[in-house]
């Protein structure tokens, strides 16, 4: 599967403007989004991942139509959504949109699902409350299946919970993390450990200001990053291919054989108590029978 990660800038001023009911909907901002999406389409990527808080909610229908037309999936952070309420403080949500295209009876469609951020970062919650708003917390995580690709989505600070980030071991072929985070060293350690502990691909996308956007595989230090990027003034994408079937085939082998075969030079062995039955069910397309 060909994955593209966006390398683009997030602005703190855009967050402030949302809270002031003066959102930035400039042509320049739209053109940057358009350039990224068009680049992904030209490169025929299967999935494009954008950072946390990136996409204005009002532009989602346009993006959904583009996904349907080109059969390209997109995972993107949605700019903070402020909902004004009568006689109550406005409610502010941090959403991640998962847009999955499909074809039904020769017609092209796309499905949008929203993940509500479960754990808001302390400074994020503080800023929301400083504008006399209330932060909305989610209460669940989702496991997605699209074209036999099983993945879950986490939004930045959620990854700091050991319990939350470990719940999809063996089930998820990949963990996708959308971020707006300057503590890249801390999150780098989390992602590298997560990739090995869950034995899956990790796709992390952060603002280009802080960087460390990457695709990481459960491998040794020298080869763990398929791509990694920071900085740059222009909005662009970087892409690489993840071998989902190859990783599953490796996971199904015993620990001793994993270390001996040639793929053992590419992947680290699976951790103790890894659920091989789940991988087998994915290979036989029967995992739907056991997930809730």
Give the ranges of each region predicted by the language model:
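CN hydrolase (nitrilase-like) catalytic-core segments centered on the catalytic cysteine
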Residues: 62-75, 159-266
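Cysteine/selenocysteine-centered motifs that mediate thiol-based redox chemistry or coordinate metal-sulfur cofactors
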Residues: 143-157, 254-292
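Short, surface-exposed connector motifs at secondary-structure boundaries
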Residues: 42-48, 145-149, 170-175
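Cys-nucleophile CN-hydrolase/nitrilase-fold catalytic domain and related Cys-dependent amidase chemistry
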Residues: 22-115, 181-183, 190-192, 196
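Active-site-proximal beta-strand elements of phosphoester/diester hydrolases
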Residues: 1-22, 114-116, 149-158, 176-178
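Short, compositionally biased "basic patch" segments
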Residues: 1-22, 29, 124-144, 220, ...
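Active-site catalytic loop in hydrolytic enzyme cores
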Residues: 87-170, 189-190
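Short catalytic-loop micro-motif centered on adjacent basic/acidic residues
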Residues: 48-52, 151-154, 175-177, 203
């Amino acid at each position: 599967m060909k994955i593209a990660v966006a390398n683009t800038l997030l602005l703190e001023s855009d967050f402030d403007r949302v809270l002031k009911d003066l959102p930035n909907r400039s042509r320049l901002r739209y053109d940057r989004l358009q350039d990224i999406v068009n680049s992904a389409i030209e490169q025929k990527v299967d999935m494009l991942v954008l950072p946390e808080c990136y996409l204005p909610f009002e532009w989602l229908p346009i993006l959904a139509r583009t996904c349907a037309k080109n059969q390209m999936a997109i995972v993107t952070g949605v700019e903070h959504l402020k909902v004004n309420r009568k006689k109550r403080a406005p409610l502010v949500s941090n959403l991640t949109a998962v847009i999955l295209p499909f074809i039904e009876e020769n017609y092209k469609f796309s499905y949008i699902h929203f993940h509500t951020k479960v754990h808001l970062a302390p400074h994020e919650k503080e800023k929301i409350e400083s504008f006399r708003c209330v932060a909305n917390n989610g209460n669940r995580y989702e496991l997605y299946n699209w074209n036999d690709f099983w993945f879950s989505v986490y939004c930045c600070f959620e990854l700091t919970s050991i319990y939350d980030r470990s719940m999809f071991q063996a089930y998820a072929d990949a963990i996708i993390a959308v971020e707006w985070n300057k503590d890249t060293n801390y999150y780098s350690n989390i992602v590298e450990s997560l990739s090995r502990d869950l034995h899956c691909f990790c796709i992390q996308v952060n603002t280009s200001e802080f960087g460390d956007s990457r695709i990481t595989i459960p491998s040794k230090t020298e080869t763990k990053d398929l791509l990694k990027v920071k900085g740059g003034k222009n909005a662009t994408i970087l892409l690489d291919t993840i071998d989902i079937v190859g990783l599953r085939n490796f996971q199904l082998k015993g620990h001793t054989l994993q270390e001996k075969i040639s793929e053992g030079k590419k992947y680290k062995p699976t951790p103790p108590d890894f659920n091989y039955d789940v991988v087998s069910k994915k290979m036989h397309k029967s995992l739907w029978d056991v997930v809730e």
